[in-house]
Swiss-Prot record:
Reactions that this protein is recorded to catalyse: tRNA(Asx) + L-aspartate + ATP = L-aspartyl-tRNA(Asx) + AMP + diphosphate
Recorded name of the encoding gene: aspS
Record-marked site positions (Important for tRNA non-discrimination): H311
Region of interest (Aspartate), ranges: 477-480
InterPro entries assigned: Aa-tRNA-synt_II, aa-tRNA-synth_II, aa-tRNA-synth_II/BPL/LPL, Asp-tRNA-ligase_1, Asp-tRNA-ligase_1_N, Asp/Asn-tRNA-synth_IIb, AspRS_core, GAD-like_sf
Name of the molecule in the record: Aspartate--tRNA(Asp/Asn) ligase
Lineage per the UniProt record: Bacteria, Pseudomonadati, Pseudomonadota, Alphaproteobacteria, Rhodospirillales
GO biological process, one term: aspartyl-tRNA aminoacylation
Family: Belongs to the class-II aminoacyl-tRNA synthetase family. Type 1 subfamily.
EC identifiers of the protein: 6.1.1.23
Biological function: Aspartyl-tRNA synthetase with relaxed tRNA specificity since it is able to aspartylate not only its cognate tRNA(Asp) but also tRNA(Asn). Reaction proceeds in two steps: L-aspartate is first activated by ATP to form Asp-AMP and then transferred to the acceptor end of tRNA(Asp/Asn).
UniProt organism field: Paramagnetospirillum magneticum (strain ATCC 700264 / AMB-1) (Magnetospirillum magneticum)
Length: 876
């Protein structure tokens, strides 16, 4: 090859430096270039058109006029191929000069191209990149690390501004070419530059080359549209995949550069310094991302020191972040060993090193990263942790008050962290499911008026209006109904609700969240049809394979639910069905029950399948439990093979015993317990017994979510203390039968269009078809003892709106916290809330509630009148 056969020709721009440019006539068919590059630069005659677009100041992408330099795209190929050609020609001094020339040429373009990127990044500054980050690599960028080179490539095509003159498009093809050069047979490389290329690296290179349309595709169609970028940038997921591809190519190119130009270390040209500019300052990958295919690359990780293990000459550190754990290895002879050895657990560090495969016997199949480890070369301590009050690693139990006081540490623990991520994904699913059904999301006010909805309000004093208070909403009830009156057909929101009530296992004190929704022109069946697929879907999606009741869910009337299950929120996993056995005890020889029945009591039978063979101590234990729960005891009959046994059986005629056995669907080998009281307390106690026996005998169906609707709630009930009629549940429900029922029926016989959705004995939601007519609303409240003036005072806004045309409407509000609690299989709702209060409604982390300075109270015109402490009575 003659020395004059150069592929470069000058291209000058006013005010710009001379830059080499590929002569397509030289490239096409030249033996120094592979067919793919010849096709790329000269195929289909598109090269000139591309150069014209690059040089057009008014082009759509805003590119400034400049030349296309080959960079490493051709530099790597030229060096390898020309070394081979010169050696074969044996041209002596001419060959040496030729080699020197092409060496300098190739080295210049590798250095210039990569340092150009680094300089571009430094000139623009990180803040400008970060400003465009979401539009460049997607919102979930940590899952696909935003390597600076990938971010740069994305930014230049997606952000049209005037600083693009610092970027050279040949960098893209340079990265591809550096890797592609490694696929040349070792015999054609100087000093065997490609003899240790792994199959994984070849696969990455081939995949990447095809992604970018370089290999085997000639000039792809995307160039014919005069855009320089591949279709991989059309969606966030494709951009993320491209980011990973580019990062992989850079890593491989870096590891092979010294072999492509032997004797000319890359550090001499600032290549490694430029490459360090490509890696993010804190991480190139997450701690849950590296796999066996990444072996050989350089990686940077940041996270918390999860565990440390000192094996003498090696220190193993499990580094943890939000995404997972990666094992890092530090040799005792390493200069960074001392710094890392002193880092306590939960210190935050950044490590840089080489990814290597673990040996077969050290692979950890429990970790997604268990096939690799990081050989640490550099360590930066970001922050040192104090001695921990609670350990993050491990599964040690701690008192709840300590966990809540150090909740930020507790949230790092694997199970708690997973619960919060589950909560986030569930909320996202619910939101998308509702939008998919045509619902529109709105945000209703947080500061509103106080209204009597069954619990105490949290009150907020008004500084501007002395003596007056706002209230935090117990639910968006009135606002969502007003939205229907305002003409919005389907509303929903993930609504915060605030109630000043005591906490319990399935209820967080203070605040909770619900999937609140409302619909116009609907019946009860329409509401069910709207929410059932959402609930069925979310439990199937996140239920870890557990069975879910298929829609439509079964419906149980309130009366049947109280009779058969002893609760208006039945747990259908429990097969026990309660039976009414009042009549067999009426006038019987068992005087205790007979007398109570004569006074209006009822008797409920709670079967205990297969319990006849239990020892006497088991029955005595249940009897003691009943007394602890306020009952006089728990009578029972054992249906043994040799006949009924127990104190009650001895005082009943055989016919009555058989009637009980038939009514409760009992068989030999079963036992039965009894509850005798007025209807409501008897039903509630029987429900407690049903739950207790189901758990004692391990009868509950496993790995299943059992849904049902409880319907036909009574509109009114009698207050046992006052003897007055009051609303039993939601006062805004439409009475079944409308005005006619209110005028002509006994209030205690009127049912409402009201319903609850229940799963595994947990009430997820109450809902109703609303009372949208002012005349019916006035009458309904009148029966419950409220005057028209009272209704107008407390519900005037909604009532006034109804006077101007209100559509029939209804809705519900499944509790988000309870949904997540069930999916996470947690017994306590505080386990799925980020920063919960304790049972006493205290936030131990933020020390709330807290005393307020007197001057702030004066601004609010509030004087605190604390209860006087009780005086101790001294004995003697």
């Amino acid at each position: 090859m003659a020395a004059t056969d150069t592929p470069w020709r000058p291209f000058r721009q006013a005010g710009a430096l001379r830059r080499p440019m590929i002569d397509p006539a030289f490239v096409q068919g030249h033996p120094a270039y592979p067919d793919a590059f010849a096709q790329f630069f000269a195929g289909h005659g598109r090269y000139g058109h591309f150069a014209e677009r690059v040089g057009n100041r008014n082009s759509r992408n805003g590119w400034r006029r400049r030349a296309l330099a080959p960079g490493p795209a051709v530099g790597a190929e030229i060096v390898a191929r020309h070394h081979e050609a010169a050696a074969q020609a044996g041209q002596g001094g001419d060959a040496a000069r030729h080699q020197h020339r092409v060496d300098r040429l190739g080295q210049h373009h590798v250095r210039a191209a990569f340092e150009q990127v680094g300089r571009h990044f430094r000139l623009r500054g990180r803040s400008e990149h970060d400003r465009h980050r979401k539009g460049i690599v997607g919102a979930d960028s940590p899952a696909h690390p935003p390597h600076q080179i990938a971010r740069l490539l994305h930014a230049e095509i997606r952000v049209h501004h005037q600083k693009v003159d610092h970027f050279r498009p040949e960098v893209v093809f340079g990265i591809v070419a550096v890797v592609k050069a490694q696929q040349i047979p070792a015999s054609q490389h100087a000093k065997g530059a490609g003899d240790d290329i792994t199959a994984a690296e070849v696969e990455i290179a081939q995949q990447g080359a095809h992604t970018w349309g370089v290999v085997g595709h000639g000039l792809p169609s995307w160039q014919e549209r005069t855009t320089f970028w591949p279709p991989a940038f059309r969606s966030p997921s494709d951009r993320s995949a491209t980011s990973e591809f580019v990062a992989g190519l850079v890593n491989i190119g870096l590891s092979r550069l010294d072999k492509i130009w032997p004797g000319m270390p890359s550090s001499r040209f600032g290549f490694k310094r430029a490459y360090e500019g490509f890696m993010h300052v804190y991480r190139s990958h997450t701690c849950g991302q590296l796999k066996a295919a990444d072996a050989g690359i350089q990686a940077r990780l940041s996270g918390w020191v999860h565990r440390k293990r000192d094996h003498g000459n090696l220190l193993f550190v499990d580094l943890r972040d939000h995404y997972g754990i990666t094992q890092c290895v530090i040799d005792v002879s390493s200069p960074v060993f001392a710094a890392l050895d002193k880092a306590r657990p939960e210190s935050v560090i950044t490590v840089t090193g080489k990814v290597v495969k673990r040996s077969a016997e050290t692979i950890n199949p429990r970790l997604p990263t268990g096939e690799i480890e990081l050989q640490v070369a550099e360590v930066e301590i970001q922050s040192i942790a104090d001695v921990l009050p609670i350990q993050v690693a491990g599964d040690q139990e701690y008192p709840e008050d300590m966990r809540l006081r150090y909740r930020f540490l507790d949230l790092r623990r694997e199970d708690v962290h997973a619960n919060m991520m589950l909560r986030s994904r569930v909320i996202a699913y619910l939101r998308q499911a509702m939008i998919g059904q045509g619902f529109t999301e709105f945000q209703t006010p947080i500061l509103t008026a106080s209204s009597p909805e069954g619990a105490r309000d949290y009150l907020v004093p008004s500084r501007i209006h002395p003596g007056k208070f706002y209230a935090l909403p117990q639910a968006p009830q009135q606002f969502k109904q007003l939205l229907m009156v305002a003409g919005f057909d389907k509303y929903f929101q993930i609504a915060p609700c605030f109630r000043d009530e005591a906490g319990r296992a399935d209820r967080s004190p203070g605040e909770f969240y619900q999937l609140d929704f409302e619909m116009s022109y609907v019946t009860q069946d329409d509401v069910f049809a709207a929410i059932e697929p959402v609930l069925e879907g979310v439990f199937k999606e996140f239920g870890k394979g557990r069975a879910v009741t298929p829609a439509p869910f079964p419906r149980i009337t309130y009366a049947d639910s109280m009779l058969k299950y002893g609760s208006d929120k039945p747990d259908l996993r429990n097969p026990i069905i309660i039976a009414d056995v009042t009549e067999p005890f009426r006038g019987s020889g068992f005087g205790l029950f007979a007398k109570l029945v004569d006074k209006g009591a009822v008797v409920r039978a709670i079967p205990a399948p297969g319990a006849a063979g239990q020892p006497r101590s088991w029955f005595d234990k249940l009897n003691d439990w009943a007394r602890e729960n306020g009952a006089g005891g728990l009578g029972y009959i054992q249906f043994a093979a040799d006949g009924p046994k127990g104190p009650i059986a001895k005082n009943l005629e055989p016919a009555r015993v058989e009637a009980i056995k038939a009514a409760a669907n009992l068989k030999d080998g079963d036992a039965v317990f009894f509850a005798c009281d007025k209807a409501l307390p008897a039903a509630k106690f029987a429900g407690l017994v049903r739950t207790k026996i189901g758990n004692e005998l391990d009868l509950l169906e496993k790995d299943v979510f059992k849904f049902c609707w409880t319907v036909d709630f009574p509109m009114y009930e009698i207050n046992e203390e006052t003897g007055l009629v009051e609303f039993s549940h939601n006062p805004f429900s439409m009475p079944q039968g409308g005005m006619d029922a209110l005028l002509n029926q006994d209030p205690l016989t009127i049912n409402a269009y009201q319903y609850d959705i229940v799963c595994n004995g947990v009430e997820l939601s109450s809902g109703a078809i609303r009372n949208h007519r002012p005349d019916i609303m006035y009458k309904a409240f009148e029966i419950a003892g409220y005057s028209a003036a009272h209704v107008e005072e407390h519900f005037g806004g909604m009532l006034n709106a109804f006077k101007f045309g209100a559509p029939p409407h209804g809705g519900s509000a499944p509790g988000v916290d309870r949904i997540v609690m069930l999916l996470a299989d947690q017994p306590n709702i505080r386990e799925i809330i980020l920063f919960p209060m304790n049972q006493q409604a205290q936030d131990l982390l933020m020390q709330a509630p807290a005393e307020i300075a007197m001057e702030r109270l004066r601004e609010l015109h509030i004087k605190v009148d604390l209860p006087k402490p009780k005086k101790e009575v001294k004995e003697g």
